[in-house]
Amino acid sequence: LGKDRLAGDEIDLISINSSFINAQPLPLPYSGNERIIEPNAYDILIAGWCRYWNDIFGPDLTIEANFIKALIESESRFNPLAIAKNKKSVGPARGLVQITEQTLKILKDRKGEIKDHYIDIEKEELFIPSKNLCAAIRWLFRKREILQKRLQRSPTWVETIVEYKGLGPDLKKNGHRSLKVMNDFLSIYKRYR
């Protein structure tokens, strides 16, 4: 009872709904120096999915479109077909916000760690921007929930990114690489603020 599940076709329908398409505010336009193909092409989807999940979870600290746009730039440089190899147990990361196979399994598993708002899509669908964004933002809310329990306080979204990127508590995992990954994200995020 009360277990909400979004399948691929429902995600498609939500993302063409007029209130979704007209969600505000849109993220700021890309202003980086890299030559990136269509970096602003996903702005409506970003704003729509931020609003959708903020409405669902009603967090004390809402997730912002600029934050998600910075995350996309740091994860895939706006390439919806990006794929990154990972440890076999985690599986490759796919799409705009680099969702791993392990994460997708968790988002689908009705007997697992999440208790509601499942995302029921196939790994190939992670290359579809709307589905990738839907899953990624849902996963960020889960990561924030885990972090909140551990810290015993309301974490910032930047703190949540450390968890999302798998950099471990206090950036201790992977040594200097963790710091480099976080600094890359923070310098990108700064441009969107």
Describe each model-derived feature in a short phrase.
Residues D4-R193:
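Catalytic glycan-binding domains that act on GlcNAc-containing polysaccharides
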